[in-house]
Amino acid sequence: PGGKSINAALKMSEQGDCGRVIARDLSDYKVALIDENIKRLNITNIQTQVYDALDCDESLINKADIVIADLPCSGLGIIGRKPDIKYNASPEKLQSLVDLQRDILKVVSRYVKSGGVLMYSTCTINRAENEDNADWICKELGFTKDGEYHQLLPANNSGMDGFFVARLIKN
């Protein structure tokens, strides 16, 4: 956990003192793992918080240049590493995840300032969680697609995971 946030913090520190990263997760355990990596890598421009993404942090509204929304998903892109995922998937569970993702997106999209970037990512290959959600963000939350969506499909025996990322600009 925290790989995208840590990478963002490292990239920012390479460019000088140009900002800070707030890495949040609902799980104490995952935040502790992120903290271990931050300490190991001696990163100073990142702060971790145990935080429920469904709770709006009023102090961050319209403040962020970039928000990376790496949301809970069905994980269908990592089924090669976690084959038990296929036994837990159902149309109802998938729809429930889409609903949760959209509820979180309604909150975190508010943190992005006008002209800022929302990076939406998942580790699934499910269209409803990916392209459909990204299109919904543009239609319902006032964002514009910036380039093409990127979907990586896991290839047979490649060891690669499937994932999705969309770069969206706030109007």
Which role does the model predict for each range below?
Residues 24-33, 85-112:
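Glycine-rich S-adenosyl-L-methionine
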Residues 1-16:
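Conserved SAM-binding loop of SAM-dependent methyltransferases across substrates and taxa
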Residues 13-16, 43, 112-114:
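Helix-to-beta-strand junctions that scaffold the AdoMet/dcAdoMet cofactor pocket
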Residues 24-62:
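S-adenosyl-L-methionine
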Residues 75-87, 123:
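Conserved P-loop NTPase nucleotide-binding/switch module
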Residues 12, 38-39, 138-141:
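Conserved hydrophobic residues forming the short capping helix/wall of the S-adenosyl-L-methionine
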Residues 54-68, 72-74, 95, 102, ...:
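C-terminal catalytic and target-recognition region of SAM-dependent MTase-like enzymes
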Residues 16-24:
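Short beta-strand element of Class I
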